[in-house]
Amino acid sequence: MDNEDKISISAKEEKILSFWKEQDIFQKTLDNREGCPTFSFYDGPPFATGLPHYGHLLAGTIKDVVCRYASMDGHYVPRRFGWDCHGVPVEYEVEKSLGLTEPGAIERFGVANFNEECRKIVFRYADEWKYFVDRIGRWVDFSATWRTMDLSFMESVWWVFRSLYDQGLVYEGTKVVPFSTKLGTPLSNFEAGQNYKEVDDPSVVVKFALQDNQGFLLAWTTTPWTLVSNMALAVHPELTYVRIKDKESGDEYILGQESLPRWFPDRESYEWIGQLSGKSLVGQSYEPLFPYFQDKKELGAFRILPADFIEESEGTGIVHMAPAFGEADFFACQEHNVPLVCPVDNQGCYTAEVKDFVGEYIKSADKGIARRLKNENKLFYQGTVRHRYPFCWRTDSPLIYKAVNSWFVAVEKVKSKMLKANESIHWTPGHIKQGRFGKWLEGARDWAISRNRYWGTPIPIWRSDDGELLVIGSIQELEALSGQKIVDLHRHFIDEIEINQNGKSFRRIPYVFDCWFDSGAMPYAQNHYPFERAEETEACFPADFIAEGLDQTRGWFYTLTVIAAALFDQPAFKNVIVNGIILAEDGNKMSKRLNNYPSPKMIMDAYGADALRLYLLNSVVVKAEDLRFSDKGVESVLKQVLLPLSNALAFYKTYAELYGFDPKETDNIELAEIDRWILSSLYSLLGKTRESMSQYDLHAAVNPFVDFIEDLTNWYIRRSRRRFWDAEDSADRRAAFSTLYEVLVVFSKVIAPFIPFISEDMYQQLRGETDPESVHLCDFPHVVLEKILPNLERKMQDIREIVALGHSLRKEHKLKVRQPLQNVYIVGSQERMEALAQVGSLIGEELNVKDVHFCSETPEYVTTLIKPNFRTLGKKVGNRLPEIQRALAGLPQEQIQAFMHKGQMVVSLGEETISLDKEDITVSWASAEGFVARSSASFVAVLDCQLTEPLIMEGIARELVNKINTMRRNGKLHVSDRIAIRLHAPVIVQEAFALHKEYICEETLTTSVSVIDYKEGEEWDINGHAVSFVLERVER
């Protein structure tokens, strides 16, 4: 494709964008459906602090397709755009730009100053977002956007929280939760699950000395930094443990029996002392590894506890427990009254209690801790292990699990409601419902919603010194309690508000909400529910449709479900499409640093937004699978789908204008069989599109487009070309024009939701004066059942299967399509052969064969050979396969032909018989000299390849036509221009030209031919003969 084509595509789409904008087409689509049933849609809010990428364009395209379709199908579809404004993504950008990276830097800078800086950059890339949203062809309402930082939105978030609190679903507690030391705040479980990486971590086995010199307990860990906080060890009471003596050191060790070979692979290296049960170890005491918390022994620390979660598949069967840094450790120690110590600050550094490592980052301390243990003879093994480890989804730093005081939503209390809500949601793809999302719901944990951050919606809890709480659910309530006018709900506006009530002073707790709480509340907060637009909000709840990426099964889809199930015992949405991840072509994550992908703007400038949309929609990424993005794939869509469609339109326009066809004058037209076929194919496609869209299956909706465009351009138009060229105003020509007009108009509406630019271009070139102004203002077409003719479609499918089979034979045996052959034999069932007998001439034309013979038996020129399909039959018959092979080799042709018809046969192996079907047999053919054969699913084709002199001469004539018409196109001649030819060629080519002069002149609009004896003009190879032409346009 040349640069001119690329420029014209981009320019044409820009022109259509201008048309939509100038004529306010999007608003007219809304006005057009005012009063119709509402199709409600929630748009997952992006952050405008980063530029949009292919993932955003993909999700935006999916949303746009569904909303456009719903609008054309008779629904009012409001499409408000929303912005996620709060949280770490914004804070992190400000911290970096202002250099506020040290602990306490934000407080010194001032929370008010910091939050106002956050407010300033929230819409840093809003213009770029609007550009890309528009350029991809997506329609959204930017004039009515909602923002999570707006006062109205934040007030509704408070209402949601207060409602949860009133239902007893909010509590304060200390739990071990995922913690980002880079951010200094806890994260939710679903945030922790979003960014796992394969990493190499330390792997150490530590020697814990039992009291009174009774040997050592061996415990394995990948987090040596937690060993300074060890408070207990745990064993499984039902497992068997062993005591052995290491011959080299003389030390006695206790570990799980099943793990013994892992750590002592050499049986000669130790002396067996005996077995003991886990239960017998419970309650025993051991010496602390480090001196920092020895005083906790009096409070119950440094004991062996029972724990039934221990497995021996890895480790030693004995688990080291640091209750501040492991959820299972925390609960086990809590149950047995073991004290908790947490000598790690919010930046992940040791506090003063660990005097030897104070101020050191915990992950950096791993080596020093292992070194110290080794020096003190407390280290049994040191190595590394590769495993999956969670990283902060925003800062890409390693997470830890840390006991913190936090506020929680009691998700586990409403788990049954969430599972019930999920049952009524239609998921695409369907496996996510009970798979990734359903399993996540089943394992749902209480949600830590408080964050030690600044730029977010403050948690509306005021607490008195004696612990009494006031939970505020509205601005009016806060104003009434505080006596102050509230103009903003961010921290720096309300942190200093003190409420005095009943002789007590209440101050707000110093936390903001997890920003996922904001987005989970958007169905209500976007409309300031319940303070405004309550009826509208309730009427549109649950949403008819949402769509986002696979990661949102543990993000937005989840938080929406938590809040909707808890507050309303309903799902938040009825239908959801989940897309996969777009990777770079090399399979890696797209990276600006690595420059491993082309920019979206470059792709749309080069190939157009429609090509990008269709490439994405027709890929596995809309089925929640990963896609390796390829610009060649986008280019292929343009070349193989969109340009042929444009060419079909250009063909119609050219000849309709040439002959003055008026689509309104189509009464009493008798359609040809090929007309009825393409219309039947069109309305069958329409039915499939409607069915697929009802199931939100965009891949299934789009996939048939490609085949239909092939049917239209490479079969219907090509086969009907002469009908359009008919100089007389015949009924057949009018039928062809009428059919092609109907197909193009209806198809432009079918594809409008998916590829909105080319559909608009088609429609604008076809629409009449009284038709709607835009294709997107049209109703989506309905199926016309009487035009669907399944038998005719099946018949045409058979014809095309035979033609494809014949062409594959020609290609395989290097027989040019333009070289005529004398005979082709088509073998199939009697019923099908009889149905196809009337179209022999059509097949002959397509295959360039003079005589087409339909047979129910393989002709004498071919012998059918069969042998076992070793892959499938080997599983069925095992070692009897050689016997079957011999039996098949001896079968007569009559039996083989019977098998070819029935698809089954019975083979006798002595007294036993075995039934075989088509999948058990491999078929091939041995052809007589001059013949070649091949089969498809339904037919066998046998080509007679023998060339006679007349066939050779006709082949030369056809090559001449092809080359002359190529020169016409290259010379930019109009389709109706007449030409004169000067020809230099050898005698055989001159003879072929003379013999087929009428055919050649008619096909090329040639009025005169003169043979010259010198080379002139462009030179061509015509079946091995050097020929040159000069073409000149002739005035009529």
UniProtKB/Swiss-Prot annotation:
Monomer. One of its GO terms (cellular component) is cytoplasm. Catalyzes the attachment of isoleucine to tRNA(Ile). As IleRS can inadvertently accommodate and process structurally similar amino acids such as valine, to avoid such errors it has two additional distinct tRNA(Ile)-dependent editing activities. One activity is designated as 'pretransfer' editing and involves the hydrolysis of activated Val-AMP. The other activity is designated 'posttransfer' editing and involves deacylation of mischarged Val-tRNA(Ile). IleRS has two distinct active sites: one for aminoacylation and one for editing. The misactivated valine is translocated from the active site to the editing site, which sterically excludes the correctly activated isoleucine. The single editing site contains two valyl binding pockets, one specific for each substrate (Val-AMP or Val-tRNA(Ile)). It holds the Pfam family DUF5915. HAMAP family: Ile_tRNA_synth_type2. Its cofactor is Zn(2+). InterPro entries: aa-tRNA-synth_I_CS, aa-tRNA-synth_Ia, Anticodon_Ile_ABEc, Ile-tRNA-ligase, Ile-tRNA-ligase_type2, M/V/L/I-tRNA-synth_anticd-bd, Rossmann-like_a/b/a_fold, tRNAsynth_Ia_anticodon-bd. Keywords: Aminoacyl-tRNA synthetase, ATP-binding, Cytoplasm, Ligase, Metal-binding, Nucleotide-binding, Protein biosynthesis, Zinc. The lineage of its organism: Bacteria, Pseudomonadati, Chlamydiota, Chlamydiia, Chlamydiales. SUPFAM superfamilies: Anticodon-binding domain of a subclass of class I aminoacyl-tRNA synthetases, Nucleotidylyl transferase, ValRS/IleRS/LeuRS editing domain. The keyword Nucleotide-binding applies. PANTHER family: ISOLEUCINE--TRNA LIGASE, CYTOPLASMIC, SOLEUCYL-TRNA SYNTHETASE. A motif ('HIGH' region) lies at residues 46-56. Belongs to the class-I aminoacyl-tRNA synthetase family. IleS type 2 subfamily. GO terms for molecular function: aminoacyl-tRNA deacylase activity; ATP binding; isoleucine-tRNA ligase activity; tRNA binding; zinc ion binding. This is Isoleucine--tRNA ligase. Its EC number is 6.1.1.5. A motif ('KMSKS' region) lies at residues 589-593. ATP binds at residue 592. It catalyses: tRNA(Ile) + L-isoleucine + ATP = L-isoleucyl-tRNA(Ile) + AMP + diphosphate. GO terms for biological process: isoleucyl-tRNA aminoacylation. It is an enzyme of class 6 (ligase). The keyword Ribonucleoprotein does not apply.
